């Protein structure tokens, strides 16, 4: 009985909760669904632009992932993978399954080992109505001459960029070639007129025409400025007007026979005034100059040589050189007699000469003594080459020669 009452109370409580207090029906809230484990979503960042890849693309055969726009611009300049440096043969993009994908072959870029493929876009090399095929051929030869492993930049980046932009919109190769040919013809026809080029390309690209033309003109202007900075190629150059014949003819008419006989040329320069290059170089060559140190060393060396000669002459009494000895003067007689009495004839004369040179009272005029016939006494003079004469007192007399050492020889 108790169980029945409790069951009825439970049923009444459920009904009241379902119909509400005032009798309105209130449906029960549905039970929440079971929670699922959410794995973190991995977003691929492009290694080239370091941003989230909007359209994911993979390179074959290395299967590295990049942005589609980034890897397409990269393959325009090099077929090497930015990550592993392997040769990229094609690009996979818009991959839905193993059987649904788009594969774009890579062509027209520089290989890793320095080899170049065929130029992109059928070999177009026309910039603003002028043919640059010869120039592109020369520059490609320069790129091949570089060492292996070097990545050469595209020689005509305007059309490489244009071909890449068209390839992002049109995937069919024949249609892509036709569109590029049409753009080249428009550029050849209208040149640098931006308005006419925009009007001619408007049916093909629609609303994207203005942005495409603006970018195309900017890249073309940069390329043209770069080409103007470079030196002209071997097949190009500046054509100068050669007026040498007309000038020579006019000079021959104006010049008279007298001027021709005098040796005057058409330029007005006389051949008589011309000198050899060696002579003019010798005339303009400056005279050698000695440094002060070398000059002082040379002066000291000359003084030592003079001093040595003076000592030798004093020891031999001037007989070896054939000089006539003379008596010392009154001012220097005391020093000479003192040297002669102290050390004999030979060494005494050397000591006397040294003392005479070291004495500060001797003047430069009195230090220079030369033997003269009038100053020498007849009894002291000795014949040339004979024995030394003796004085009246019988004591030997030494002959002293004084040479001024303060003056240098020229």
Swiss-Prot record:
A zinc finger (RING-type) spans 46-85. Keywords: Activator, DNA-binding, Early protein, Host-virus interaction, Inhibition of host innate immune response by virus, Inhibition of host IRF3 by virus, Inhibition of host mitotic exit by virus, Inhibition of host RLR pathway by virus, Metal-binding, Modulation of host cell cycle by virus, Modulation of host ubiquitin pathway by viral E3 ligase, Modulation of host ubiquitin pathway by virus, Repressor, Transcription, Transcription regulation, Transferase, Ubl conjugation, Viral immunoevasion, Viral latency, Viral reactivation from latency, Zinc, Zinc-finger. It comes from the Viruses. GO terms for biological process: protein monoubiquitination; protein polyubiquitination; release from viral latency; symbiont-mediated disruption of host cell PML body; symbiont-mediated perturbation of host exit from mitosis; symbiont-mediated perturbation of host ubiquitin-like protein modification; symbiont-mediated suppression of host cytoplasmic pattern recognition receptor signaling pathway via inhibition of IRF3 activity. Residues 287-315 have a biased composition (Basic residues). InterPro entries: Znf_RING (IPR001841), Znf_RING/FYVE/PHD (IPR013083), Znf_RING_CS (IPR017907). It catalyses: S-ubiquitinyl-[E2 ubiquitin-conjugating enzyme]-L-cysteine + [acceptor protein]-L-lysine = [E2 ubiquitin-conjugating enzyme]-L-cysteine + N(6)-ubiquitinyl-[acceptor protein]-L-lysine. Residues 243-410 are annotated as: Disordered. Residues 329-340, 348-399 have a biased composition (Low complexity). The keyword Transferase applies. SMART domains: RING. Evades nuclear antiviral defenses triggered by dsDNA viruses. Acts during the initial stages of lytic infection and the reactivation of latent viral genome. Prevents the antiviral effect of nuclear bodies by degrading host PML and SP100. PANTHER family: E3 UBIQUITIN-PROTEIN LIGASE TOPORS, TOP1 BINDING ARGININE_SERINE RICH PROTEIN, E3 UBIQUITIN LIGASE. This is E3 ubiquitin-protein ligase ICP0.
């Amino acid at each position: 009985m108790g169980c029945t009452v409790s069951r009825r109370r439970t049923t009444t409580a459920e009904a009241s909760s379902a119909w509400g207090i005032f009798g309105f029906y209130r449906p029960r809230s549905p039970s929440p669904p079971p929670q699922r484990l959410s794995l973190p979503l991995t977003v691929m960042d492009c290694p080239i632009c370091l941003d989230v890849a909007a359209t994911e693309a993979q390179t074959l055969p290395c299967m590295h992932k990049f942005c589609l726009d980034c890897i397409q611009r990269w393959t325009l300049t090099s077929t090497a993978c930015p990550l592993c440096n392997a040769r990229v043969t094609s690009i996979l993009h818009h991959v839905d399954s193993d059987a649904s994908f788009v594969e774009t072959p890579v062509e027209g870029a520089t290989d890793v080992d320095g080899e170049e493929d065929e130029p992109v876009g059928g070999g177009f090399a026309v910039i603003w109505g002028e043919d640059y095929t010869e120039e592109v051929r020369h520059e490609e030869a320069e790129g091949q001459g570089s060492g292996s492993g070097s990545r050469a930049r595209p020689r005509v980046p305007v059309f490489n960029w244009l071909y890449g932009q068209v390839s992002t919109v049109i995937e069919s190769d024949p249609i892509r070639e036709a569109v590029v040919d049409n753009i080249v013809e428009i550029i050849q026809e209208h040149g640098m007129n931006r308005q006419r080029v925009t009007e001619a390309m408007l049916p093909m690209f629609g609303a994207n025409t203005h942005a495409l033309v603006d970018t195309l003109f900017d890249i073309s202007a940069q390329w043209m400025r770069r080409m103007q900075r470079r030196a002209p190629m071997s097949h190009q150059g500046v054509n100068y007007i050669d007026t040498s014949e007309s000038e020579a003819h006019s000079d021959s008419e104006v010049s008279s026979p007298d001027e021709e006989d005098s040796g005057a040329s058409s330029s007005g320069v006389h051949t008589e005034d011309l000198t050899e290059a060696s002579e003019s170089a010798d005339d303009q060559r400056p005279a050698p100059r000695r440094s002060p140190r070398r000059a002082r060393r040379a002066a000291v060396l000359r003084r030592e040589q003079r001093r040595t000669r003076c000592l030798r002459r004093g020891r031999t009494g001037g007989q070896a050189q054939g000089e006539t000895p003379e008596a010392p003067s009154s001012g220097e007689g005391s020093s000479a007699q003192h040297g002669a009495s102290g050390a004999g004839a030979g060494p005494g004369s050397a000591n006397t000469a040294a003392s005479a040179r070291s004495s500060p009272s001797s003047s430069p005029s009195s230090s220079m003594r030369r033997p003269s016939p009038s100053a020498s006494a007849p009894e002291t003079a000795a014949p040339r080459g004979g024995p030394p004469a003796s004085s009246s007192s019988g004591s030997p007399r030494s002959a002293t020669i004084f040479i001024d050492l303060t003056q240098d020889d020229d």
